[in-house]
């Protein structure tokens, strides 16, 4: 059973080999696979890194009483030589950046900084790139703390967009592997912004006529490339969200955002296990989830400028249940944690939900990310079952409910008492009759109206933006104008409708209407009429 529901082999293709090693180490103590097979898998991951001693140790575990391959010793010699070579290349760079006066003199403009460093310290871009290579070599050796530091300083100085993006991934992996969860979370947000910025480039490139004559595009500037990188980011984010104190809430907020939810449904639907688990774990401690929506003006889910949709835990469960129902053709029966929610809220089958809860507890105990939350997850599942059961019954048999919760009679009675007390439910417990009497409650009318109309504002804004974009197709220049300096639509702006804009960004048409009234009350000469005719045509639009 455990082998059937284990996701390790599914997750590994989306992880760096260094991130995959902890997952295999966790499997070694789970009893799902033999230790020899796990050691062989660990060796296959480690042998192409510069962790020569660790790879040799794994080889001895995987292939006992066999001589070590000759390439391991050769790999050791190459690693020592490369370390000396790269170390000498970065000596001058490290000497410069460790000078406090240099750090205080650096500006926001990287090109200006590079020119200043070259003039004053004879520091070239090639020497700065050596810092990148040395950082990745340290990462390959398993020195993750040093790698994080070197890649950070490289990113501060470098003007190379490709290497800068690569350094983001390297620093994120390094921070994860040393357990710096605050830094890793900050790096995750930065990398997410970089991917969203790339999405704007993709939108602009698709809006422009093709000039590549069939040549291949940069992988970062294709929809397929962005989809692949977002899938990687979702998998890497699991390490952070299940270790950071507030990670479960943030996992729900990120994974339920439209861009990443589409990624999950398209390429990695197995991550729904962790969405469901995070939602169940956080629903009683979170009043509202702040889910970012795509920013209509730029057609991307920008972290800094996105619209935020507030979801209550109840609404979040409804949304994820709808997604599970739509994906049931390929996920039904593949994951007990997901099936638990499906049986409970789609099929309303309490007996089947009880069976899935038993399986879910076993799966969570073996899962790398959920093992530490097994007891909390089972408790959250029991709360969900009891809430659903009591919602449709006015009189609940305690013995029957305890059975559905997989508890003994004594533990079940204590659990029900604590639940009624903690949730402040309007209920009366009669132990003589063995019943719980529920007093039905209904939400206020105004709360129901708010829930029904919550998304109207965003949908109206998106519709208006779509109409405006249809009339004024985006160009490469105005798509990248994220600083609010877009002149399209301003008075005299290219392709605009005329009229001044007020501080809220809306077109002020009163000025145009006053001009029309003034012109109607005056008799203009033929020459004046010819001059005013274009302005009237613009204002009329």
Curated annotation (Swiss-Prot):
Keyword terms: Cytoplasm, Initiation factor, Protein biosynthesis
Biased composition (Low complexity): 523-541
Keyword Lipoprotein: no
Molecular function terms, GO-annotated: translation initiation factor activity
Positions of the PCI domain: 252-443
Extent of Gly residues compositional bias: 490-502
Subcellular location per the Swiss-Prot or TrEMBL entry: Cytoplasm
GO biological process, one term: translational initiation
Quaternary data: Component of the eukaryotic translation initiation factor 3 (eIF-3) complex.
Xref: HAMAP family: eIF3e
Free-text function comment from the UniProt entry: Component of the eukaryotic translation initiation factor 3 (eIF-3) complex, which is involved in protein synthesis of a specialized repertoire of mRNAs and, together with other initiation factors, stimulates binding of mRNA and methionyl-tRNAi to the 40S ribosome. The eIF-3 complex specifically targets and initiates translation of a subset of mRNAs involved in cell proliferation.
Name assigned to this protein: Eukaryotic translation initiation factor 3 subunit E
Origin species: Mycosarcoma maydis (Corn smut fungus)
